[in-house]
Amino acid sequence: MAKLAITLTRSTIGRPEGQRVTVRTLGLRKMHQTVVVPDNVAMRGMINKVSHLVTVKEINE
């Protein structure tokens, strides 16, 4: 099953509350922090919501 490596590349300062909550829900707290999450519809939806703040790489295992 594929996984996604998500890195927070832009700050959430000055962003709407919904975007801040989405970034926190993805497990990101600090700039340049990377988390590995499963590749599913829910995660893809959250990534689309904050795509301008994060970078995503696909990991094949």
Curated annotation (Swiss-Prot):
Any one of the GO BP annotations: translation
An example Gene Ontology molecular-function term: structural constituent of ribosome
Keyword Ribosomal protein among record annotations: yes
The entry's keywords: Ribonucleoprotein, Ribosomal protein
Cellular-component GO terms for this entry: cytosolic large ribosomal subunit
Database matches in InterPro entries: Ribo_uL30_ferredoxin-like_sf (IPR036919), Ribosomal_uL30_bac-type (IPR005996), Ribosomal_uL30_CS (IPR018038), Ribosomal_uL30_ferredoxin-like (IPR016082)
CDD domains for the chain: Ribosomal_L30
Family designation: Belongs to the universal ribosomal protein uL30 family.
Protein known as: Large ribosomal subunit protein uL30
Organism: Exiguobacterium sp. (strain ATCC BAA-1283 / AT1b)
Encoding gene per record: rpmD
